[in-house]
Amino acid sequence: MFASVNSVGLFGMETYPVRVEADLSAGLPRFDMVGLPDAAVSESRERVRAAIRNSGLDFPVSRVTVNLAPADIRKEGPIYDLPVLIAILKATGQLKCDTEGCAFLGELSLSGRVRGVHGVLPMVMEAKKSGFREIYIPYENLAEGAVVKGIDVYPVKTVDALLRHLRKEETIAPVSASDYTETTLPPDLPDFADVKGQQEAKRALEVAAAGGHNVMMIGPPGSGKSMLAKRIPSILPDMTFEEALETTKIYSVAGALPKNVSLIKVRPFRAPHHTVSPAGLSGGGTVPRPGEISLAHNGVLFLDELPEFSRTAMEIMRQPIEDGKITIARVAATFSYPCSVMLVCAMNPCPCGFYGHPTRKCTCPPGAPQRYLSRVSGPLLDRLDIHIEVPPVDFDELSTSEKAEPSAAIQARVNRARERQLARLKGTGITCNAKMDAALTREFCTPTPAAATLLKNAFEKLGLSARAYDKILRVARTIADLDGAEQVDVPHVAEAIQYRSLDRKFWLE
């Protein structure tokens, strides 16, 4: 006897339809699985056998062969437990129903309960794309399954409940796809109103948020670098539905989606510790999973104490932060994960932290500050659009009772600047100034003659690279957008050059 049912496979971030085929033949009882299953898939034999028996059904006393097609792609994880069980029951005649337009996925417990799995959102999207009219998913994954419209999504708690539904003895209600609404910022999101002083740093971060620029903050301990960084998500533009969907897919694949959350609507803020491994930062592992840089997609990746990160971890980010994706090459396959992030780095100017402090004396031996700062390579520094000094806050600023400008007011200006960018970049597939390539930079960031002269003098004096030249133009364009100006003029270029001053002050002295 032969039967087959549909499922969906997950390969990195890519999904594909899978046909689960079951064949019963004469011979000594055994249960074989073919189609490049990994260990977790092979182990499903025992889970399926026990789930069938504990659901009051009979496991066939014959030779059972299950094939997962296509057979040239390795199958990973326990997501095929449920479709394998359905295929076997159909092959034995214990389940008689039409499942041709249906897809199944889910892990089984030995008792017959259906457990949640990773990656349900992209797999439901693939099922819709493949033309399936129904998909049966674990009840635990109900929230993310509800995001997709155009396909009936049925949440399943147990094998018994699913079989009763398929036999039309009982009904499982499909989940209702919810409409996307932009969310207001959660009340517990840190606000810039809490930050005393640091007006120059706040202005630089406003420019960075408006244009999606990468930032380096350098200053002594306690000056507020981490405090400022944690408040950046509160001034970034609200996520669009497409951005929320992309981000949620990554969290779904990584198994990091919070319980009962259907969509991630607030921009991620990821702050890995400096002891993170290169694989933890970039992604990978035996079963490849997205790393911190991908989990920060459409949000902020904050690297505090940058020189303390391993050289490999730092250098691994150079290409991804420019390309907006990271590629992990393995012998068996190559995986790509999106990572369009706003990279924010912070560091002390020396090991003790007080090099250049106005009142505290640096206790490092001669040459230590330069050696410490040289841990950050020039090519990585070159990819950071904005460098800002965060000096210590004086007593008068700390003790004032006046409230600082709230994040909502800053976000309003950022939104207006982004709207100008979107209108200017319409049709290019780019959403902010920082993502422009060299050709678009020349087209949209042309300075006035006086501004061009200023930029030329700075280029020669600071010994800037071609990449730094383009970044100054893009930052100047963002400053002009914040001012509502059509042309990039002298004040805009002057402020943008100011944000490259760390090249000269610390790294080149």
Say what each PLM segment does.
Residues N298, D304-E305, I316:
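Walker B catalytic acidic pair
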Residues E170-V207, G211, D238-I293:
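P-loop NTPase nucleotide-binding/switch module
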Residues S111, L303-S310, G353:
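Catalytic P-loop NTPase motifs of RecA-like helicase/translocase cores
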Residues M1-M216, P220-S226, A329, Y469, ...:
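Peripheral, non-AAA+ core regions of ATP-driven protein-machinery
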